[in-house]
A protein has these predicted regions:
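Beta-rich nucleic-acid/ligand-interaction surfaces
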Residues: 83-92, 195-196, 204, 238-243
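Conserved pre-motif C helix in the palm subdomain of viral-like polymerases
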Residues: 45-77, 152-180
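Right-hand nucleic-acid polymerase module
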Residues: 53, 58, 62, 68, ...
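Active-site-proximal segment of RNA-dependent polymerases
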Residues: 61-123
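Reverse-transcriptase-like RNA-dependent polymerase core
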Residues: 20-45, 59, 135-150
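Inter-domain linker/hinge segments that demarcate the starts of reverse transcriptase
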Residues: 16-26, 216-228
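Conserved polymerase palm-domain catalytic core
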Residues: 23, 97-200, 204-221, 239-240
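Non-catalytic, polymerase-adjacent accessory regions of viral genome-replication enzymes
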Residues: 1-22, 330
């Protein structure tokens, strides 16, 4: 956007800012209802309800997050991933790889679980209780409470604020399991687990002692139910690292290599094979190719990449997307 065109927007932005200020000051925030759309997630093989909020509500989301970001980031642990800058699937994968390969004696036993219907299960009253304890600014509490009350139930998938609230809420469980669970032997404190990683509501605990990891998992489950009013899915697993890979974030992580999850591999393979050797690739497939490529780039997949000539296909896909972006600007 040219400087002249940008300057024309300044009076409008100034007017909107004043209106928002008055709404907050007078406790009269008015927002249109969130529209919900059901979308199928092919990777998870489930239908997700995505909330699409008004532009005005999105502005309030950014106001709330920017004002509270320092507090959110102080609470959210380093090994809580998803929906945070530079802390996505690759970050989580690399952390687990480092743990199981540099010090496998501390990762002999794995507990893996995920929270049952996490987003819709977050109690509005309960999360407000935590926020009230951590935020002392009454205006900010009013804004966040108002935004939370617009959600049909729990938190809202698709909301910028909800991404931070989700990680913030689970941070209490993370700190509990990593800092509060230990045994004392001969006057020395020994943590029940050595490592923990939360990929949003997917949870993994790693330790050297089966009994200790099992106890930590049980106490974590009790904490979630009592303090966060959440439950784990009954499909949670406790297993030795040498018996199977850690299947998480789209990867299968072994103690000696990492591969792509079978379902993702099959979906990606269809797209790669369909476009192998093509000079013209559709825009839809181009986006898929770039999306899937990351999984193969960071796994034990060099032979496969060479077999399907993925580097050449990727180059064409990037050109297609680049040309599409330029055409929109023009």
């Amino acid at each position: 956007m040219a400087v002249e065109e940008r300057e024309k927007l300044y009076p409008i932005i100034d007017y909107i800012a004043k209106e928002i200020f008055l709404e907050i000051k007078n406790r009269r925030i008015k927002l249109n209802p969130i529209k919900y759309d059901e979308r199928y997630d092919p990777l998870a093989k489930k239908v997700r309800e995505i909330g699409v909020s008004s532009m005005k509500q999105q502005c309030y989301d950014y106001i709330a997050v920017n004002a509270c970001k320092e507090m959110f980031l102080a609470k959210i642990s380093h090994y809580q991933c998803a929906s945070l800058k530079n802390k996505g699937q690759l970050f989580g994968k690399q952390a687990i790889e480092t743990w199981v390969r540099t010090n496998p004696s501390k990762c002999k036993w794995i507990f893996k679980a995920d929270v049952k219907k996490f987003y819709p299960s977050v109690s509005h009253d309960n999360i407000k209780k935590f926020l009230k304890r951590d935020i002392k600014n009454k205006d900010m509490l009013y804004i966040i409470y108002t935004l939370i009350d617009t959600y049909k139930e729990g938190l809202c998938i698709g909301s910028y604020l909800s991404q931070y609230l989700a990680n913030y809420y689970l941070s209490y469980a993370y700190h509990f399991v990593t800092e509060m669970l230990y045994t004392e032997r001969r006057g020395k404190r020994q943590n029940l687990i050595h490592h923990a990683l939360f990929y949003m509501d997917d949870i993994i605990l790693l330790g050297s002692n089966k009994k200790h990891v099992k106890k930590a998992a049980m106490l974590l489950q009790e904490y979630l139910e009592k303090h966060l009013l959440l439950t784990l899915k009954p499909t949670h697993q406790l297993f030795p690292l040498n018996s199977r890979p850690i299947d998480m974030m789209g990867y299968k992580i072994y103690s000696y290599k990492t591969t792509v999850r079978r379902r993702i591999f099959n979906n990606a393979n269809k797209v790669f094979v369909r476009n192998k050797g093509k000079e013209i690739i559709s825009l839809e497939d181009s986006y898929k190719i770039i999306s899937y490529y990351g999984y193969f780039k960071h796994t034990f997949s060099k032979k496969y990449i060479k077999k399907v000539k993925l580097d050449k296909t990727l180059k064409i896909a990037k050109e297609v997307i680049s040309n599409e972006a330029r055409s929109k600007v023009l």
